[in-house]
Amino acid sequence: MEGTAESQTPDLRDVEGKVGRKIPEGLLRGLRGECELGTSGDVLLPGAPSTGHGLGDKIMALRMELAYLRAIDVKILQQLVTLNEGIEAVRWLLEERGTLTSHCSSLTSSQYSLTGGSPGRSRRGSWDSLPDTSSTDRLDSVSIGSFLDTVTPRELDEQGLPGPSCPEIDWAKVIPTEDRARTEVDMTSTKLGSLTATWKLPGDGLQCGPPEPSEDGNANQGFEAHWYWGQCQDDVTFL
């Protein structure tokens, strides 16, 4: 039996000579066991222990499997490290892009707020910030005569109250020469008419005394004053 097993074992001397090392006994025993299993016609059950393998062979097989698993673990770890580096690179790119996008959006929003919402109005932004002068134009269009009309009644009411005398206006500079002469003649005739109405001769039985103003004279004076004021107002408006 032993002779048949040794004869079926392959000759490994050439391999030992080329490698320079002796073939391990475990490998030889494994080869011998395979040969015995191939020659014997006995069928072993899956759970039954093999007769040709000892405890040392099982330990060696377990060590080889552990080394193989460790090599696989090392490869998996290397792949995981490479994958982690790629993920970190992509994450950094996304963060930088988000930062640049937010910065650009903030700059764009500030530019739009300064330009008033449209790039075309950027050149006119300074002009839009200037105050509106339309109100001053409206004030300039108001005539001086209407302004005097609003101020005159209040001033006339205040003339009856005691207070400092108002400065007199040099009407000679305001009223033209012809109108001024006509106004003086009319006022002189009005005064003469009032004096004629109040003063009478001594033969009429009336005592001479200071003239008393009549109602007609007061009405005429009021009319003349009103006409005089209207003429002045027209002249000022014309100027």
From Swiss-Prot:
The keyword Aminoacyl-tRNA synthetase does not apply. One of its GO terms (biological process) is positive regulation of canonical NF-kappaB signal transduction. The keyword Phosphoprotein applies. It comes from the Eukaryota. The modification Phosphoserine is found at residues 118, 126, 129. Phosphorylated. Pfam families: LURAP (PF14854). Residues 105-138 are annotated as: Disordered. LRR repeats lie at residues 55-83, 93-114. It is found in: Cytoplasm. Residues 105-116 have a biased composition (Low complexity). One of its GO terms (cellular component) is intracellular membrane-bounded organelle. Keywords: Cytoplasm, Leucine-rich repeat, Phosphoprotein, Repeat. Forms a tripartite complex with CDC42BPA/CDC42BPB and MYO18A acting as an adapter connecting both. Its binding to CDC42BPA/CDC42BPB results in their activation by abolition of their negative autoregulation. Interacts with CDC42BPA and CDC42BPB. Acts as an activator of the canonical NF-kappa-B pathway and drive the production of pro-inflammatory cytokines. Promotes the antigen (Ag)-presenting and priming function of dendritic cells via the canonical NF-kappa-B pathway. In concert with MYO18A and CDC42BPA/CDC42BPB, is involved in modulating lamellar actomyosin retrograde flow that is crucial to cell protrusion and migration. Activates CDC42BPA/CDC42BPB and targets it to actomyosin through its interaction with MYO18A, leading to MYL9/MLC2 phosphorylation and MYH9/MYH10-dependent actomyosin assembly in the lamella. This is Leucine rich adaptor protein 1. It comes from Mus musculus. The gene is Lurap1.
